[in-house]
């Protein structure tokens, strides 16, 4: 991030001194090569303020992605990075960005010099937290704009001058188009984090508009993506300068998941799924555990149920208000032990400390989602953790896809006589508790709808589900009557009608 110089005139605006390309290239290569083999942060040409902050954070040695990425970024190169979650890439892009703002002596009146775009509000808050620690001893300003937050307060802060801005795509585009006093003409660097996820959740058009609005003259850009798709390549083409440096720290590894991760699966009929989960959570309630489910309604039901039967859990899903999601996220982060029941909203990029177990209670959509889910544990260079995936007998075909994606799993077995048989109590509870019964029915319907929407139709076939057994896992002795709609037609598939999924 050192290919240009900025100086302020009397009015406080930034003026660029254009430098010959040969001078920039030579300086770039020299700077990159001088730190190319650095392993520790103090071997990089960092400011004393940044080194002090890194020391306070407890970091000394760089992860592989940091060692490969930071030197070329500090030398001004555009970077396209492929790194699995838990690799330390947040520090890899924030550190050079902060150093650049420091070296150019950015002040609030210069406006925004760096923008970091990230897919979710939780991930934005996470990056904001890291930025706050890194910038503790710097004078530059930093801020965050995310959907669900107070837009007017954000606009006021932008007008005062935010040098480093972390944002979600929709809210950023809103401010770029509508906020007077938002100075972004001096933008020097753009970071797109979790690019594949940004595109997966439907922000392709917003990203194209954002790229079009932002100044691109002499702008350094970096794009990080856990997976490389055609759409990611298209976004890279319009956002990065020609000839970016491609860094893939995972290509030489034998596995696609973290080295310190023990991974297993258990084969379990649908009617025994909750009983096994309950037994497992009871046994390990002194650990830190994340349980993934496929829908918001399923999360709401199982969280309500577990809390009701005195197994305290936290819940995190997309239907919660932003403040509730933020509070839950930080409460779980700060806890030494506990259980978080959540949807995939928490699966990407969030850095939750010291997670012992990842439980995939509902199956992931594909191997990529599996990898992102288990990326919540065994993070960093020496991280350790375990994961357990629940599969029914007819879902075992998913293991072939995981094997092809270089994911090593072992089968775990749980003795049938050790599984707590609370089925009759569960059914009795739903019979007498109207509210819980209603939430359970919503969860059951949403589970079926999510199942029918799976992309791997050869593995997840709704016709092969035993609805009586599925209903039992939600506490119903017989399947409740529900209506599910799939696709744009708004009609339930013929297979569902045959299974007598009637009106709610």
Curated annotation (Swiss-Prot):
Biased composition annotated in UniProt, kind: Basic and acidic residues: 1-10
Bias (Low complexity): 23-36
The keyword Translocase is annotated on this UniProt entry: no
GO BP, sorted A to Z: maturation of LSU-rRNA from tricistronic rRNA transcript (SSU-rRNA, 5.8S rRNA, LSU-rRNA); maturation of SSU-rRNA from tricistronic rRNA transcript (SSU-rRNA, 5.8S rRNA, LSU-rRNA); snoRNA release from pre-rRNA
Keyword line: ATP-binding, Helicase, Hydrolase, Nucleotide-binding, Nucleus, Ribosome biogenesis, RNA-binding, rRNA processing
One Pfam family matching this protein: Helicase_C
EC number: 3.6.4.13
Predominant subcellular localization, coarse grouping: nucleus
UniProt motif DEAD box: location: 193-196
Region (Disordered): 1-38
Annotated GO CC locations: nuclear envelope; nucleolus; preribosome, large subunit precursor; small-subunit processome
Swiss-Prot/TrEMBL catalytic activity: ATP + H2O = ADP + phosphate + H(+)
Locus of motif Q motif: 39-67
Subcellular location: Nucleus, Nucleolus
Binding site for ATP: 83-90
The keyword Amino-acid biosynthesis appears for this protein: no
SMART domains recorded: DEXDc, DUF4217, HELICc
Domain-level remarks: The Q motif is unique to and characteristic of the DEAD box family of RNA helicases and controls ATP binding and hydrolysis.
Described function: ATP-dependent RNA helicase involved in 40S ribosomal subunit biogenesis. Required for the processing and cleavage of 35S pre-rRNA at sites A0, A1, and A2, leading to mature 18S rRNA.
Protein family membership: Belongs to the DEAD box helicase family. DDX18/HAS1 subfamily.
Protein name: ATP-dependent RNA helicase HAS1
Organism: Eremothecium gossypii (strain ATCC 10895 / CBS 109.51 / FGSC 9923 / NRRL Y-1056) (Yeast)
């Amino acid at each position: 991030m050192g290919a240009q110089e900025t100086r302020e005139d009397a009015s406080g605006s930034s003026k660029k001194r254009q430098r010959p390309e040969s001078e920039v290239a030579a300086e770039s290569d020299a700077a990159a090569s001088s730190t190319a083999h650095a392993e520790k942060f103090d071997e990089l040409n960092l400011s004393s303020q940044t080194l002090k902050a890194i020391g306070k954070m407890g970091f000394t040695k760089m992860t592989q992605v940091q060692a490969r990425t930071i030197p070329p970024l500090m030398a001004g190169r555009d970077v396209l990075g492929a790194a699995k979650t838990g690799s330390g890439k947040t520090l890899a892009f924030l550190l050079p960005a902060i150093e650049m703002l420091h070296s150019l002596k950015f002040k609030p009146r210069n406006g925004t010099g760096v923008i970091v775009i990230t897919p979710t509000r939780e991930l934005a808050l996470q990056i904001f937290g890291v930025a706050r620690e890194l910038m503790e001893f710097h004078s530059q300003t930093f801020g965050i704009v995310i959907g669900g937050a107070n837009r007017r307060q954000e606009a006021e802060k932008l007008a005062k001058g935010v040098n480093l801005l972390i944002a979600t795509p929709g809210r950023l585009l809103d401010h770029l188009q509508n906020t007077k006093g938002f100075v972004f003409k001096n933008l020097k660097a753009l970071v797109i984090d979790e690019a594949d996820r940004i595109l997966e959740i439907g922000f392709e058009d917003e990203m194209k508009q954002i790229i079009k609005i932002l100044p691109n003259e002499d702008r350094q850009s970096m794009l990080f993506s856990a997976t490389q798709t055609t759409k990611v390549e298209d976004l890279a083409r319009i956002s990065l300068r020609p000839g970016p440096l491609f860094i893939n720290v995972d290509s030489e590894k034998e596995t696609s998941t973290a080295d310190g991760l023990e991974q297993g699966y258990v084969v379990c009929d649908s009617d025994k799924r909750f009983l096994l989960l309950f037994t497992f959570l009871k046994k390990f309630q002194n650990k830190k555990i994340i349980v993934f489910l496929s829908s918001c309604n399923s999360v709401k039901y199982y969280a309500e149920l577990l809390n009701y039967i005195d197994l305290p859990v936290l819940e995190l899903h997309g239907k919660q208000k932003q403040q509730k999601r933020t509070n839950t996220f930080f409460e779980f982060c700060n806890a030494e032990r506990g259980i978080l029941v959540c949807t995939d909203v928490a699966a990407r990029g969030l850095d939750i400390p010291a997670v012992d177990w990842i439980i995939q209670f509902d199956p992931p959509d594909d191997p990529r989602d599996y990898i992102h889910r288990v990326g919540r544990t065994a993070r960093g260079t020496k991280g350790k953790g375990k994961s357990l995936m629940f599969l029914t007998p007819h879902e075992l075909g998913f293991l072939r896809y995981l094997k092809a994606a270089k994911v090593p799993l072992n089968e775990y077995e749980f003795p049938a006589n050790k599984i707590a048989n609370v089925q009759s109590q569960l059914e009795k509870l739903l019979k007498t508790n109207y509210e819980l019964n209603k939430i359970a029915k919503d969860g059951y319907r949403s589970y079926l709808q999510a199942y029918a929407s799976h992309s791997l139709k050869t593995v997840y076939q709704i016709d092969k589900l035993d609805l009586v057994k599925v209903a039992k896992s939600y506490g119903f002795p017989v399947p409740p009557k529900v209506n599910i709609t799939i696709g744009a037609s708004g009609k339930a598939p013929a297979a569902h009608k045959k299974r007598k999924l009637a009106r709610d």
